[in-house]
Amino acid sequence: MKKETKEWSQIAKDDREIAIEMWKTKRNVYAVMFWQQAVEKIIKAYIVESIDALPKKTHDLDVLLKQAKLDITKLPFSNVKELSLAFTRTRYEDLSRKHYMKRSVVEPLVMMAEKLYLWIEKQLK
């Protein structure tokens, strides 16, 4: 595994650990924000390792998945747009209150992010 891949993977792992802790402590806004970041960074690790390219400087998971040439259509979800939006929305108090205060709204995003993260991590090994 390349040095840069290891760095991206470690940052992704750290973000995942924070996301899990935030979810356990019912800090929904931070949970979804860190899950989005964990997924973004594990995709970037995959791009560095498998595509041998620099990942695009974006938070848009669709763009990164396309660059990585990862086909998620066989996963139980295929629309990661809402998870991509989460990073931007959580950065603004009015948007984070509007979208991510209810656990019932955040839970599907957390579950999707965890499945996607683990699937991409498996592709890396």
Identify what each model region corresponds to.
Residues 1-125:
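Terminal alpha-helical segments
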